[in-house]
Amino acid sequence: MFSVFIEHYKNNEKLRLFTTIIVVWLLSRIVMQAMVPVMNLVADTPHNLLYYMNPWDAEWYKELAEEGYKLPRSSGMANWAFFPLYPMVCALIRIITGGYINTYAIGMLVSNICIIIAVYYAVRFAWLELDTDKYDRVDIENIIIFLMFAGPCAVYYGSMYTESLFTMCVVLCFYNTKKKNYMMAGVSAALASATRIVGCTLIVVLFTDMYVSMYKQHRDEERRIVAAIKAFIKDVISDAGKLLALAICPLGIFVYMTFLRGFCGDAWAFYHVQKAWRTQKLFPVIGVLIKSCTGRLGEMSDVKQINGIILGWLCVFTLLMYVIMLVRKHYACGIFGIIALMIPLTSSVMSTLRFIVGSFVVYIGITEALLLTGRNTRRVIMVLLAAAEVICISAWYFWDGLLM
């Protein structure tokens, strides 16, 4: 009986992939739990896993799941800064379970289910996106699974934060786009746009893929770019399915804006309330990066000087990696990655780590970079990345603003 299962396991790629994902996920969560008593040794007051895993915005999502949207606090902060899909899912499970389960535990359950699904389809997308004639499929699989469960900042995916749900939607959008299933890609983008503001920009993924397909079809024409653009426009207009897929991409944010219009009279309330968090005004992107990288954010900044320097340079290197991805013809990944990072950089470097990780495409860039190294070098790098994740978990448990 056992030998039959082993044989089936070896021959069934989907089962093998899912099993590997579950094992690595479980090991990563054991590490997170094991670090709780270690943290309690140095903490002023001992706490449990639910406390350590859910700092900052998790409190807002807990409030949303339990009480819904409310009027602003005296500080000017309001929970309508946070998009509705994730807390709605948590609220639904809370209702189904009769409120007997801790809301943080529900949020973590949702996040963990979403990230497992995300990693499964992330591997399948990576197989399609990366050159499997050049790179080994198992190596691609192992690196993606490692990065998303044990790489730096993977701790986000276990918390009551939107990162897991958003990443799942992004991955499904990329995967379905690559498979030319544009309608499902559009639905995934719509769900992403109801989860975080960056989600509405996933429309560029569909646009890019459709255009590149047309560009390849006109490779023999002299004015190739012009011909491809004309063919692309004609194809989209004449294909109701593609047109609808593109149209529904920002549906989530439009529905939320309609709700806000009726709730507080301001469809852009989620944007306007951000000034309660980001008090410093800097020139978008360039000014933010220059001030951050040179440690000149000033006293008005919500980010510590050292954290600002680290985040600033991480953003610079990440943007450079996205440019390299464009050069290596990962067009949709590179374009979306740049846009997804530009949005927070219009005002601050705060939370940019979450935007980088949540956009998912960073994993494709890192995976290809690791595949280009020798096996021994790759193993050393992955050990260092795992050590960095342990540091990230420690920083997260102690509410370090670097990971905010």
Put a short name on every predicted segment.
Residues 28-40, 44, 53, 192, ...:
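Membrane-lumen/periplasm interface segments of specific transmembrane helices
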Residues 55-70, 75-99, 286-293:
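Short hydrophobic/aromatic helix or loop-helix immediately within or flanking a transmembrane segment
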Residues 80-84, 97-117, 156, 302-312:
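Loop-to-helix entry region of an early transmembrane alpha helix in multi-pass inner-membrane enzymes
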Residues 101-105, 122-150, 184, 331-335:
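Transmembrane-helix signature of polytopic, membrane-embedded enzymes
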Residues 106-131, 317-321:
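Transmembrane-helix motifs of polytopic, lipid-linked glycan transferases
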Residues 114, 142-177, 184, 191-202, ...:
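Multi-pass, polyprenyl lipid-linked donor-dependent membrane glycosyltransferases
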Residues 246-250, 372-402:
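Signature aromatic-anchored transmembrane alpha helix within multi-pass, membrane-resident enzymes
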Residues 324-346, 352-355:
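Transmembrane alpha-helix segments characteristic
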